[in-house]
Amino acid sequence: MEFMAATTSIADTDMEFDKNVPRICGVCGDKATGFHFNAMTCEGCKGFFRRSMKRKAMFTCPFNGDCRITKDNRRHCQSCRLKRCVDIGMMKEFILTDEEVQRKRQMINKRKSEEALKESMRPKISDEQQKMIDILLEAHRKTFDTTYSDFNKFRPPVRENVDPFRRITRSSSVHTQGSPSEDSDVFTSSPDSSEHGFFSASLFGQFEYSSMGGKSGELSMLPHIADLVSYSIQKIIGFAKMIPGFRDLIAEDQIALLKSSVIEVIMLRSNQSFSLDDMSWTCGSEDFKYKVDDVTQAGHNMELLEPLVKFQVGLKKLDLHEEEHVLLMAICILSPDRPGLQDKALVESIQDRLSSTLQTYILCKHPPPGSRLLYAKMIQKLADLRSLNEEHSKQYRSISFLPEHSMKLTPLMLEVFSDEIP
């Protein structure tokens, strides 16, 4: 009976009503459940009207024929109750026949079966994939300080032709080694690092910032930007070491992957601090708010910076989830077409797992319309990064070629951005 009551109700989709206003049964004043047979009624009056019409019942009022029907007395006078049903617009034409009820039941069952089949075929994030996502999220959070507090350890930014109040004035004591940051243990020397000879000791030792002057002059921002990039390299090494499967690679392949991808991952990560409002990277205070002019004062030109800003804008507009962002960084690092790799098949298998996880995550967790072609757009961003990487390499070589500039770079930069692949 409950099924028939549900299936013989017709919801009038053309009738709009305020959802905040209580819906009252037009027959007895009880709480209404919707439009039934063309009128707003409760379940009780709906069933009463349907039964009365099907039985073609004839009722007689034992009183004066004008009984006031309420929730409490609606069973006392069926005649006045039925009259009230008709008065508020309930129509027997809206009642389905037994054949119509059967057809509707079949349609509902068919729809439920189709929905169940569709749900069973919907991609689901496996336990293994979820574990991978969780590991990458933890790795990212351990190696990305959203407070940017370590930026105070860099050689200070010296900006030409800017308000002098924006410049940092700091005694040389800030360049001495202080207490390590919360996640610095990620980068300290470990048995694994010595076993594999991973880059040089500088990659795993506590990063020490040079006290080399931040005097105004040619490429005045280069010392600060060099420290920022070196710091970012340290963080990305820590992130890469925690990618599932990365440590399964031989040391030479780990080094080759990082040397080839690190600038691309820096560009990816920097998108978190990029603002569409003023096209700048804000890393905490105003002193660490970087615009294109700042990077030109570190030796780079618009051949790199114009497409870089375009890349940052496009990536920001994708509105990636943090899960998608960390997976994209891992996919970028684990690229089997990097130069100097010995076991490309293993790198490819790790990247395939990451890519599959990203596609599944998008299907399961990223609602439309944002998910439309999202995976393809993200992969295109990796292709854009290759072009940016190539241009960065050209400009870096020009900067590092001159001794007066290369002396402002860090040993880590000189090692990582060298053309030598082990």
Swiss-Prot record:
Residues 170-191 are annotated as: Disordered. A motif (9aaTAD) lies at residues 411-419. Zn(2+) 1 binds at C25, C28, C42, C45. Residues 241-259 are annotated as: Interaction with coactivator LXXLL motif. The keyword Nucleotide-binding does not apply. A zinc finger (NR C4-type) spans 25-45, 61-85. It holds the Pfam family Hormone_recep. Gene3D superfamilies: Erythroid Transcription Factor GATA-1, subunit A, Retinoid X Receptor. It comes from the Eukaryota. Residues 98-127 are annotated as: Hinge. Calcitriol binds at S232, R269, S273, H300, H392. Residues 22-90 bind DNA. Residues 128-418 form the NR LBD domain. Detected in all tissues examined. Highest level in small intestine and skin. Disulfide bonds: none annotated. The keyword Nucleus applies. Zn(2+) 2 binds at C61, C67, C77, C80. It is found in: Nucleus; Cytoplasm. Keywords: Cytoplasm, DNA-binding, Metal-binding, Nucleus, Receptor, Transcription, Transcription regulation, Zinc, Zinc-finger. GO terms for molecular function: nuclear receptor activity; RNA polymerase II cis-regulatory region sequence-specific DNA binding; vitamin D response element binding; zinc ion binding. Homodimer in the absence of bound vitamin D3. Heterodimer with RXRA after vitamin D3 binding. Composed of three domains: a modulating N-terminal domain, a DNA-binding domain and a C-terminal ligand-binding domain. Nuclear receptor for calcitriol, the active form of vitamin D3 which mediates the action of this vitamin on cells. Enters the nucleus upon vitamin D3 binding where it forms heterodimers with the retinoid X receptor/RXR. The VDR-RXR heterodimers bind to specific response elements on DNA and activate the transcription of vitamin D3-responsive target genes. Plays a central role in calcium homeostasis. Also functions as a receptor for the secondary bile acid lithocholic acid (LCA) and its metabolites. Belongs to the nuclear hormone receptor family. NR1 subfamily. This is Vitamin D3 receptor. The lineage of its organism: Eukaryota, Metazoa, Chordata, Craniata, Vertebrata. The gene is vdr.
